[in-house]
Amino acid sequence: MKEKVNVLAKKLKPYSIPGAITLAVVLITLILKGIWPFGGNRIDYFDNMQQVAPLYAHLWDFMHGKASLWFDWYTGLGTNVSMSISAFSMLSPFNLLLYLVPRNLILESISILTAVKMVFMSVAMYALLNHKFPKLLYPVKTAFAVMYSLCGY
């Protein structure tokens, strides 16, 4: 049994390194910028505050039985949000973590949700690169996986 655990750990280790590097970069950025939970700032700049944050609030309301997933009565005279829900990745399984967050901390929790998504983006990209380019050197695959996860941030 112990041997199986060691084999599994050895297989998973290369996949965990890109995620760990991404997490370190994100945490250092959050700390240096004083972004919640390491300070009072938030990452709700520009369109994040106008588009993404209200969708997180709408998703929170849906998960707690207070709203429809596809229609929002709080925007104008009501609006169909199905395109927005899909375009802004609101149906990501990682957003289920939002269920655990109190509604008054949605804006602050966006930094944590973003960090979690970025870590898994780097792991997924490493898996893709490892599958498509198995002969590519490990540091190169790791570097590109980390760069991919950070390119949208």
Task: Please annotate each region the language model reported.
Residues 26-125, 146-153:
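Membrane-interface coil-to-helix junctions
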